[in-house]
Amino acid sequence: MNSSSNIIYKSFKNSKIFLNKQCIINNGLKLNKKYFTTTSTKENNNNNNNKNPKFIENNLFQKGLLTIGSAFVAFINPGRGDMVATLGEMTGGCAIKSMKQKMMLDPIGRQLLKEKPRIKESTYPLNIHLLPSTTFGGAYYRWMKEHGYSPDERTEVTLIQDEDDAYVMQRYREVHDFWHVLAGVRPDFQGEVAIKWFEFLQTGLPMNAIGSIIGPLRCSWNERNELINHMIPWAIKSSKSCVYLMNVKYEDHWEDDLNEFRAKLNFIPYKYLSDINQNKTTTINM
């Protein structure tokens, strides 16, 4: 990173306005709302009937500030999950509507929208830690523990007003780790870029398109080589072959054999080149 970029980054790092969406909403440049409202009073009254209870009111200026600020910080530091989440909420509009429409056309999707189940540690089955690693639930549990993740850490959706739209985004965040397990893709930077390609083709979310295009530029040469020549083609093929994954109630499949569950979904897992080469070497030495 050059000196000018360092100066910009440090200024953003020290700025609560750009690094904290709550601060932008509550304190960010208190402009007269009548010049920046995005919906009419009539529309607001209609939306209140199906309003996300966690929604934080924001105006047009604040939306722009959040979008630009979160995009900049997420690019500089992809590890900032809160900024990545904010960017997703700010840019997801049409894609989220399309995702919801696909769910409404499917019986399981409609059930999910109606019941709005959450993926939390408190909703895990009591025996999940006892499930074999060959099962979907057992593989998921061990994958989460191995990488130190918890579904409880997923950011709550607060910038999408419609309750169903907000749930679609929340559900997408919470099933992200399921897709990693089904894909057999590691959660390192290279793996996340590959999953972003897969997710963009499944969901159409602009945030994933941005990550899938810019991501390879941040990879090493070797990582980029496997990513471009193998992982991205896999993501394209697998995303097209499998069912629409937002219409899957994963909670009903904890005890399913992982490979059988993949087959049921027509999900093609990824095989790393290192694993393929290792298997070839083992076979030759036998």
From Swiss-Prot:
Transmembrane segments: none annotated. Pfam families: Coq4. The keyword Thylakoid does not apply. Keywords: Lyase, Membrane, Metal-binding, Mitochondrion, Mitochondrion inner membrane, Ubiquinone biosynthesis, Zinc. It is found in: Mitochondrion inner membrane. Its cofactor is Zn(2+). GO terms for biological process: ubiquinone biosynthetic process. Its EC number is 4.1.1.130. GO terms for cellular component: extrinsic component of mitochondrial inner membrane; mitochondrial inner membrane; mitochondrion. The keyword Zinc applies. Lyase that catalyzes the C1-decarboxylation of 4-hydroxy-3-methoxy-5-(all-trans-polyprenyl)benzoic acid into 2-methoxy-6-(all-trans-polyprenyl)phenol during ubiquinone biosynthesis. This protein may be expected to contain an N-terminal transit peptide but none has been predicted. Belongs to the COQ4 family. Component of a multi-subunit COQ enzyme complex. This is Ubiquinone biosynthesis protein COQ4 homolog, mitochondrial. It comes from Dictyostelium discoideum (Social amoeba).
